[in-house]
UniProtKB/Swiss-Prot annotation:
Keywords of this entry: Copper, FAD, Flavoprotein, Metal-binding, Nitrate assimilation, Oxidoreductase, Periplasm, Pyrrolidone carboxylic acid, Repeat, Signal
Coiled-coil regions listed: none
One Pfam match: Cu-oxidase_3
Organism of provenance: Alcaligenes faecalis
Keyword NAD: no
Cofactor: Cu(2+); Cu(+); FAD
Assembly, per entry: Homotrimer.
Chief location category: periplasm
The record's account of how the chain is modified after translation: Predicted to be exported by the Tat system. The position of the signal peptide cleavage has been experimentally proven.
Modified residues (Pyrrolidone carboxylic acid): 34
Cleaved signal peptide residues: 1-33
EC number: 1.7.2.1
Name of protein: Copper-containing nitrite reductase
């Protein structure tokens, strides 16, 4: 195990040197490409108001204003990286997760367009691997990955301007080991709201009563010669076997929020008839097809970009791997709604399913049982 970990460590650190060398090159190239775009000075950024936000565990999202109040500001977040064992199904299957803030997925961060997101990222000395973060919402230095490589016992602070409105993936991207870290749960999402809030593309404001974040995760768990899932003492011990499974491109589990059933039963998401709910859904690695059984997507940004007018009245929407999407729905009927990846094999056999538990009065005009199931 020690030798395996040393090999992994050397690979990571060798790649880190290359990525570190790339960062100033990328920064220089970015400066040439700015053209007439005005850059704020360090003094101007330092004078901006600051807001410190405490992140919450998914599927919940920290408190935020849907319409920006005042001008741009610096929004401060802190995330601590955890390497830990998690159980991903009822059979007790274990994975050595790599988790932003200890959750799979990592927390959803919300800012407004033209705000500055400032992240303090901490890699405790109790961890064994180098980590970093690549924000798909950011510009330059590999999404920040080239500036945030931290070994155990280190921290870094990254600030970037949120220039494009939408929902975006973030993930760990250590040189030479990006896929392994991503499929070990090290990904999450950020939402950059338009300063005026969401709109339907025709001038109508869209205001949600609740927001939930669903992070879809594919796991690749090795099996032993008897077909049983293997368990390992440390992340490095699992590396070679896990990569072999990864290369088949066939996940053993596809789950929402870290485990089979994580958002079902007494952990189901909740709403009431008439409530407007925004669902943010990310998949950092594979394509997915969200579908709300018994409902619809009234307004859907399938690729997650709010400058694009939303599609309306959708039954199923397609989110490409490495992206996040958003769907806005007003619940019309009470009961249990299943929210699934409509690759039904992945939903029913591998775990990509969640529930909404909705309260309120039934509307017979929308649906009624004319004849209950009975003998002919």
């Amino acid at each position: 195990m020690a030798e395996q970990m040393q090999i992994s460590r050397r690979t990571i650190l060798a790649g880190a040197a290359l990525a570190g060398a790339l960062a100033p090159v990328l920064a220089t190239t970015s400066a040439w490409g700015q053209g007439a775009v005005r850059k704020a000075t360090a003094a101007e950024i330092a004078a901006l108001p600051r807001q410190k936000v405490e992140l919450v565990d998914p599927p919940f999202v920290h408190a935020h204003s849907q319409v920006a109040e005042g001008g741009p500001k610096v929004v401060e977040f802190t995330m601590v990286i955890e390497e830990k064992k998690i159980v991903i199904d009822d059979a007790g299957t274990e994975v050595h997760a790599m988790a932003f803030n200890g959750t799979v997925p990592g927390p959803l961060m919300v800012v407004h367009q033209d705000d500055y997101l400032e992240l303090t990222l901490i890699n405790p000395e109790t961890n064994t691997l180098m980590h970093n973060i690549d924000f798909h919402a950011a510009t330059g230095a590999l999404g920040g990955g080239g500036l945030t490589e931290i070994n155990p016992g280190e921290k870094t602070i990254l600030r970037f301007k949120a220039t494009k409105p939408g929902v975006f993936v973030y993930h760990c991207a250590p040189p030479g080991m990006v896929p392994w870290h991503v499929v070990s749960g090290m990904n999450g999402a950020i939402m950059v709201l338009p300063r005026e809030g969401l709109h339907d593309g025709k001038g109508k404001a869209l205001t949600y009563d609740k927001i939930y974040y669903v992070g879809e995760q594919d796991f690749y768990v090795p099996r032993d010669e008897n077909g049983k899932y293997k368990k390992y003492e440390a992340p490095g011990d699992a590396y070679e076997d896990t990569v072999k499974v990864m290369r088949t491109l066939t996940p053993t589990h596809v789950v929402f929020n870290g485990a089979v059933g994580a958002l079902t039963g007494d952990k189901a998401m909740t709403a009431a008839v008439g409530e407007k709910v925004l669902i943010v859904h990310s998949q950092a690695n594979r394509d997915t097809r969200p579908h709300l059984i018994g409902g619809h997507g009234d307004y859907v940004w399938a690729t997650g970009k709010f400058n694009t007018p939303p599609d309306v009245d959708q039954e199923t929407w397609f989110i490409p791997g490495g992206a996040a999407g958003a769907a806005f729905y007003t619940f019309q009927q009470p009961g249990i709604y299943a929210y699934v990846n409509h690759n039904l094999i992945e939903a029913f056999e591998l775990g990509a399913a969640a529930h909404f538990k909705v309260t309120g009065e039934w509307n017979d005009d929308l649906m009624t049982s004319v004849l209950a199931p009975s003998g002919t």
